[in-house]
Amino acid sequence: MSKNSFSSMANSVTSFFQSLTTPNRHADPSFRPSRREKQSRLPTPLQSVAASAYSGVNASQTGLLNDSRANSVTNLPNSSNTSQVGLNNISPAPVGYVPGSKTNELANNSMEMQEISPNGSASLPPPVSESWRRIDRWAEENYYELYCQLCYGATVADVDSLEYELECTLPRDVRESLYIHDGQDRGGQPTGILFGVTLLDIEEIEEESELWRRVAQSYAEATLAGKIDQAVASRQASFPPGAVQCVYAHPGWIPLAKDFVGNNIAIDLAPGPAGQWGQVILFGRDQDTKYVVARSWADFLAIVAYDMENGKWLVDEDDNSLRLIYGPPREQWSYLDILKYRARKAERRKFKKRDGKRTTRPIPKSIAKEDVTNSANSTAPSTGTTVLDDGLDNNYEDIPLYGPSKDEELIKKEELEADTDLGLINTSEINQPANLPDEPTAETSNPVSATTVEAVTTTADNKDEEKNDHVTEDVSQNSTIAEASSLQAQEEEKEIETTSVKQE
């Protein structure tokens, strides 16, 4: 027996006995969150691009290649209450992440409140447990095989070990989600609980994150060496602009679900200047534009629960995959495409609310879209920067991203394929009143053919003849009545005269 075979057998036996003695699904019973053996590769905690050493494609330094940090107190801003001598006497002490700190934070009830929303509106998402309760209930009633694929929840040690391997701090809602369902078993089918997108367990999250971190490492090295394909680099974008770092892959993107064709639903632990820590994004092989599809993982689960309860779903007969019915008839959009469309629609609603104007008639697509910057700096009398009507009434304006998402009208396919579809248009010519002439002229009026004139004239003559016939009949009837009345009067006069003669 070879050494590798013996080692594999020993690991299997050890795993079997561990499964009998510990509730952990992934972590070893001997795992201690306080131990720290790996060399950190990322600034800790992962921050936005404004505070991170990783600055994208044109970076001169990157956290992937240079692990320099600025965590010592000597780099703090100068303050009037702090003496420079005191700072020099303090030795630099880098602040590192200790796995399990999130667990201790939860136990001490010192967790910070999650941010309400990017625009400051008081619209908190439902609790993660409530969203999963709705998803479980729907799956058990409508697709029991898919419900059985959902795994049991992970333990605290499992989640702590995941943070240890990834060297990051996971958002609270992600931890809570893993405590409820630690991914799903595929069962040999490409069926995902997220409308065809499979939920990953802790082990798969580690493997997928490691894979994409190697891709990000290669991408960063090629960028610094000047060997990156400029066509690929120029296609990397963010929606909304500035919310996600415009790179192909980033070590701060933690995949939580994937479609097994190279695309992922992930949480962003290193957002752009306009982004939010813990936001849910799409990235991968077909996602050059990185879309923000939810403010947090709790928001995203609420969206999924709503879509399931909405009733517009079907099970594909070929691969038994769950699909959401959305878009034109006879076309099946992937759930990732639907999420991207909704992100654009939410951005349009934001522009509508900001400008306070909307169009009430369909706009030809041939009209050029108006640039946001130019419209904001324009000094011309503005009819306003208006947006395409998306079929939603005014009651939907203040609904958060996880609210009602039904769109009763058909979605145009060409709108989905647009690169940056904010619905912005140039209405300077459309909204101006038309210059109508006072009187119709021969040039503007439509010419009438001779045949038409003759037909109209003949019809009019026929009507006049019929009218004259009716008048003649009426006159003759009146004459007959008058003659009868005259004869009757004459006879009465004769009778009166005869009576008077007899009396005399």
Swiss-Prot record:
GO MF entry, a single one: protein-macromolecule adaptor activity
Protein's cellular compartments: Nucleus
Basic and acidic residues composition bias: residue spans: 25-40, 461-473
Entry-linked InterPro entries: Knr4/Smi1 (IPR009203), Knr4/Smi1-like_dom (IPR018958), Knr4/Smi1-like_sf (IPR037883), KNR4/SMI1_regulator (IPR051873)
Cell division keyword on record: yes
Region of interest (Disordered), ranges: 17-45, 68-98, 349-403, 422-504
Comp. bias (Low complexity): 448-460
Record's GO cellular component terms: cell division site; intracellular vesicle; nucleus
Record's compositionally biased regions (Polar residues): 68-91, 373-386, 425-434
Keyword presence, Kinase: no
Keyword annotations: Cell cycle, Cell division, Cell wall biogenesis/degradation, DNA-binding, Mitosis, Nucleus, Phosphoprotein, Transcription, Transcription regulation
Domain of life, source organism: Eukaryota
Biased composition (Basic residues): 349-360
Functional note: Protein involved in the regulation of cell wall assembly and 1,3-beta-glucan synthesis, possibly through the transcriptional regulation of cell wall glucan and chitin synthesis. Involved in cellular response to nitrogen starvation and required for quiescence-maintenance by regulating negatively G0 to G1 transition.
Gene3D superfamilies linked to this entry: SMI1/KNR4-like
PANTHER family: CELL WALL ASSEMBLY REGULATOR SMI1
Biological source species: Schizosaccharomyces pombe (strain 972 / ATCC 24843) (Fission yeast)
Name of the protein in its database record: Cell wall biosynthesis/cell cycle regulator smi1
UniProt family annotation: Belongs to the KNR4/SMI1 family.
GO terms for biological process, alphabetical: cell wall organization; fungal-type cell wall beta-glucan biosynthetic process; mitotic division septum assembly
In-chain residues carrying the UniProt-annotated modification Phosphoserine: S500
